[in-house]
């Protein structure tokens, strides 16, 4: 078995690695939005929530015509409670669920699982009252994650 050389590994800012978007006077990773249950129609697009079960999937719905309804593909979801999953398929995100998509490379299962383990270690330092929406995901230009 080849030994992994980690001598060049370093810290990175969330905003250096993942796609961000402007929000008010700051950058943040894309996030989902609250959609009333009455507006969701059964379909084939998974809806990701903060649950720790079934890869975060709460149900399957059709696309709806709303500025708040956003669909992402091939991404890592991170909820404000710290649940993290890889989604190689199209999915919509509920409120307080963030979308991590690499800036310059497509995710694959191996890269995603590696990044998930690194992110889980990093966010384990946050307490419930720090909820992730108020910490690294909401200020990705400042927060660093160390790969170790």
Enumerate the predicted regions with their spans.
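Non-catalytic DNA-recognition/assembly elements of restriction-modification systems
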Residues: 1-55
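A generic structural signal for short, non-catalytic loop/turn and secondary-structure boundary residues
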Residues: 7, 40-41, 69-71, 86, ...
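A structural detector for beta-sheet-dominated domains
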Residues: 7, 15, 103, 146-148
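Aromatic/pi-system hotspot detector in well-structured domains
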Residues: 9-12, 17, 111-119, 127-132
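Short loop/beta submotifs within extracellular cysteine-rich repeat domains
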Residues: 55-56, 122-127
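A short beta-sheet element
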Residues: 57-117
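A short glycine-rich beta-alpha junction/loop motif
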Residues: 90-101, 129-148
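Short leucine-rich amphipathic alpha-helical surface patches
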Residues: 119-123, 144-147
């Amino acid at each position: 078995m080849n030994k992994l050389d980690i001598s060049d590994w370093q810290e990175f800012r969330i905003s250096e690695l993942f796609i961000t978007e402007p929000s008010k006077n700051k950058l943040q990773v894309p996030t989902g939005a609250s959609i009333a249950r009455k507006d969701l129609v059964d379909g084939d697009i998974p809806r990701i929530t903060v649950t720790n079960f079934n890869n975060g999937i709460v149900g399957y719905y059709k696309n709806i015509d709303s500025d708040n309804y956003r669909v992402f593909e091939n991404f890592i979801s991170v909820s404000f409670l710290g649940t993290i999953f890889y989604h190689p398929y199209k999915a919509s995100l509920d409120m307080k669920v963030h979308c991590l998509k690499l800036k310059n490379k497509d995710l694959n299962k191996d890269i995603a699982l590696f990044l998930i383990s690194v992110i889980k270690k990093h966010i384990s330092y946050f307490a419930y009252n720090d909820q992730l929406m108020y910490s690294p995901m909401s200020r990705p230009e400042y927060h660093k994650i160390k790969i170790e």
